[in-house]
């Protein structure tokens, strides 16, 4: 009887932790185009459904020291998650192209520093 009680308590604990778990962040954006090395600007394109969201990862080789939004999207929102990740959310009901830019400063593994502007074109379906 005691084993059954312990098993029930564990099951209840697991179930309650699943019920109150915070939702995971948006999926990563699949971007066509490659990020250039530090000091060079890049452009990329990705697709997303209207009202959808995804996380953009600044995968510039090396270390991202700082970043900021240079140009906000006109038809969606852009939220900084951390220094190298931004969440883009397309406006509900909008279909078309939304463009925005992020500036990043960092350095290569060899220690060379640079500033890059990453411009992204979101094709909203």
Segments the model singles out, each with a brief description of its role:
Residues 27-29, 108-125:
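C-terminal edge beta-strand
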Residues 95-108, 116-118:
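A short beta-strand micro-motif common to beta-rich folds, especially ectodomain repeats
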Residues 27-43, 47:
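N-terminal edge beta-strand
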Residues 13-14, 24:
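Cleavable N-terminal signal peptides
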Residues 20-26:
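Sec/Tat signal peptide C-region and signal peptidase I cleavage site
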Residues 46-84:
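Surface-exposed or secretory-pathway low-complexity segments enriched in glycine-proline
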Residues 1-11, 17:
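Bacterial N-terminal signal peptides that target proteins for export
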Residues 85-97:
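Extracellular/luminal low-complexity segments enriched in Ser/Thr/Pro
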